[in-house]
C-alpha cells in the first residue's frame, strides 16, 4: 500500500516578517511550501526501490497547473532537488552485497539537468525496476524503452546471432578441430616412421661394412641340437691347446659316496678367457661321446677348410687374424653355470 509521510521543512518566516509587500509575502508563502519534503513509499508497484524522497511539486502539480502555465513566460520555475537510492535486486533478496544506484535530478532557474551516480553495479529501470541498460540515456530496460517509443541506439544493437549463422559457425569449428586432430595424427605417424627408418639405416650401416665377416660368424652349429647362435665377435669353432687339471668334486653334504672327479680348464678364445669344469659323462660308447674332447677325430678333418673361410672373410675386411680362430673346438667344452673349484694343494 502506498503512503505519504510528512518530513517537514525549514521555516523562513523569521527572516521575512518585516516585509510589507503583498506579492513578496505570497512568494514567501510559496517558497515555504516548496521547502516541505514528503517521504513516498510505494509497496505495490516499486517493490525494489525502497524509500524515495520527492519534493511537493509532484503532489501539487494538478493544483498549481494553471498558475504554472500563466507564469511560464513571466518567471522561471521554482528550484527543487530530488534524489533516490535504488537497489539492483528485489526487496525480498537478503544479499548484503547488492549494488545500489544513486541518482540526482536538479532543476535550476535557467537550465534543467540531471546526472546519475552509479556505485558497484548497473542502474535500475525507472519504470519496472529491472536491470537497465548500461549505456541507455533514458535509464530504462529494453522492454520499457521500446514500449515508451524512445529512439535508443543502445537497445537497437543486439548480440543475438541467427540460428543459421550459429550452425554454420559450429560446423566450421568442428571441421577445424577434426582437421587439427588428423594433422596431429599424421605428424605422429610420420615421426614414428622416421624413427624406425633411422634405426633400420643404422643397422644397414653397421652390417654393410662387415658383410662377409657377419656371414662367416653367424653360423648355427649343425652338430648340436641346442640351436644356439654363435656371437658375432667369436669364431664358430676353435682348436686350441689347453691344460686340464683333475679335481675332486662333491655335494654340499660332503658325503664320501657322492664324491666324483672332473677336469678344470681355462682357454683364451678371441681375447676372452673361458673357464669351466668338465664332468664325467660316462663311457665313451654312449650317444654323447662327441661331447668329449678326446673324441675329436671328426673335427680335425675340417681344420683347413674352416681356416680358409675365416682367413678369406678377415682379409676382405682388413682385420687382424686371431690365431686361435684357425682351430676348431667343441662348443660344449664346458657347461655354463657350473661351480669353479681350485686345484687341490699338494
UniProtKB/Swiss-Prot annotation:
What Gene Ontology molecular function terms does this protein carry? DNA-binding transcription factor activity; metal ion binding; sequence-specific DNA binding
For bias kind Basic and acidic residues, which ranges apply? 18-31, 187-207
Compositionally biased residues, Polar residues: 175-186
Is Metal-binding found in the keyword set?
yes
Give the range the annotation lists for the signal sequence. Answer: none
Q: Where is this motif: Required for homo- and heterodimerization?
A: 269-272
GO annotation, cellular component aspect: nucleus
**Does the keyword Cytoplasm belong to this entry?**
no
Q: Which domain of life is it from?
A: Eukaryota
The UniProt annotation gives the DNA-binding region as 125-152
Q: What happens when the gene is disrupted?
A: No visible phenotype.
Database matches in InterPro entries: SHI, SHI_C, Znf_LRP1
Q: Where does Zn(2+) 2 bind?
A: 125, 141, 145, 152
Name one process (GO BP) from the record: photomorphogenesis
Can you say where in the cell this protein is located? Nucleus
Write the record's keywords in alphabetical order, separated by commas.
Activator, Auxin biosynthesis, Auxin signaling pathway, Developmental protein, DNA-binding, Metal-binding, Nucleus, Zinc
Region entry Disordered, spans: 7-31, 175-215
Q: Which protein family is named in the record?
A: Belongs to the SHI protein family.
| Role played | Transcription activator that binds DNA on 5'-ACTCTAC-3' and promotes auxin homeostasis-regulating gene expression (e.g. YUC genes), as well as genes affecting stamen development, cell expansion and timing of flowering. Synergistically with other SHI-related proteins, regulates gynoecium, stamen and leaf development in a dose-dependent manner, controlling apical-basal patterning. Promotes style and stigma formation, and influences vascular development during gynoecium development. May also have a role in the formation and/or maintenance of the shoot apical meristem (SAM).
Protein name, as recorded: Protein SHI RELATED SEQUENCE 5
This chain's source organism reads Arabidopsis thaliana (Mouse-ear cress)
Q: Which gene encodes it?
A: SRS5
Amino acid at each position: 500500500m502506498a503512503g505519504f509521510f510528512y518530513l517537514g521543512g525549514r521555516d523562513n518566516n523569521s527572516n521575512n516578517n518585516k516585509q510589507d509587500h503583498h506579492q513578496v509575502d505570497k512568494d514567501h508563502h510559496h517558497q515555504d511550501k516548496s521547502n516541505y519534503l514528503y517521504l513516498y513509499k510505494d509497496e505495490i508497484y516499486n517493490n525494489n526501490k525502497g524509500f524515495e524522497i520527492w519534493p511537493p511539486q509532484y503532489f501539487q502539480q494538478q493544483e498549481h497547473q494553471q498558475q504554472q502555465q500563466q507564469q511560464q513566460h513571466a518567471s522561471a520555475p521554482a528550484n527543487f532537488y530530488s534524489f533516490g537510492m535504488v537497489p539492483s535486486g528485489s526487496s525480498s533478496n537478503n544479499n548484503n552485497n547488492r549494488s545500489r544506484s544513486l541518482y540526482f535530478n536538479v532543476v535550476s532557474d535557467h537550465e534543467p539537468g540531471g546526472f546519475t551516480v552509479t556505485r558497484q553495479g548497473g542502474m535500475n529501470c525507472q519504470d519496472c525496476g529491472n536491470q537497465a541498460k548500461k549505456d541507455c540515456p533514458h535509464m530504462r530496460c529494453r522492454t520499457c524503452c521500446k514500449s515508451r517509443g524512445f529512439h535508443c541506439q543502445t537497445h537497437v544493437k543486439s548480440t543475438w546471432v541467427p540460428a543459421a549463422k550459429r550452425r554454420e559457425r559450429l560446423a566450421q569449428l568442428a571441421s577445424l578441430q577434426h582437421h587439427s586432430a588428423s594433422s596431429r595424427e599424421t605428424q605422429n605417424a610420420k615421426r614414428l616412421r622416421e624413427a624406425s627408418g633411422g634405426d633400420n639405416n643404422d643397422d644397414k650401416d653397421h652390417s654393410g661394412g662387415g658383410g662377409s665377416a657377419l656371414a662367416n660368424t653367424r653360423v648355427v652349429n649343425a652338430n648340436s641340437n641346442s640351436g644356439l647362435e654363435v656371437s658375432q665377435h667369436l669364431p664358430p669353432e676353435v682348436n686350441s691347446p689347453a691344460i686340464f687339471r683333475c679335481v675332486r668334486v662333491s655335494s654340499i653334504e660332503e658325503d664320501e659316496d657322492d664324491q666324483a672327479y672332473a677336469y678344470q680348464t681355462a682357454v683364451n678364445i678371441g681375447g676372452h678367457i673361458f673357464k669351466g669344469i668338465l664332468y664325467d659323462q660316462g663311457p665313451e660308447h654312449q650317444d654323447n661321446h662327441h661331447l668329449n674332447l678326446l673324441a675329436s677325430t671328426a673335427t680335425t678333418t675340417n681344420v683347413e677348410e674352416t681356416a680358409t673361410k675365416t682367413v678369406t672373410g678377415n682379409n676382405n675386411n682388413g682385420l687382424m687374424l686371431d690365431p686361435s680362430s684357425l682351430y676348431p673346438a667343441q662348443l660344449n667344452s664346458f657347461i655354463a653355470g657350473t661351480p669353479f673349484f681350485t686345484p687341490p694343494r699338494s
